[in-house]
């Protein structure tokens, strides 16, 4: 994953921009950018911190929810629930 290859968030952002299949900017809470890749992994960046999520793994999704601040977690609640439900169905 890009976050593992690039500990520097600027380098990770540049690499993510080049290969992401989707980019979303969310301004709830501290604000963050999500890059989604074709292997169902997601890189989330906020300032100088980043989180790499495997959207096929419930623990990784829960870790993402924990990583978010309270306001962003509330805004992402339905997406987090959808991701967890899709993993449980598999």
Swiss-Prot record:
The keyword Transmembrane does not apply. GO terms for biological process: symbiont-mediated suppression of host adaptive immune response; symbiont-mediated suppression of host CRISPR-cas system. Keywords: CRISPR-cas system evasion by virus, Host-virus interaction, Inhibition of host adaptive immune response by virus, Viral immunoevasion. Allows the phage to evade the CRISPR/Cas system type I-F. This is Anti-CRISPR protein 30.
């Amino acid at each position: 994953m890009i976050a593992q290859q690039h500990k520097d968030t600027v380098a990770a952002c540049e690499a993510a921009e080049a290969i992401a299949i989707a980019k979303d900017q969310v301004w709830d809470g501290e604000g963050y950018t999500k890059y989604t890749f074709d292997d169902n992994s997601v890189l989330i960046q906020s300032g100088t911190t980043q989180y790499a999520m495997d959207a096929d793994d419930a623990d990784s999704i829960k870790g993402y929810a924990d990583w978010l601040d309270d306001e962003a977690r509330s805004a992402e609640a339905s997406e987090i629930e959808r991701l967890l439900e899709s993993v449980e169905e598999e």
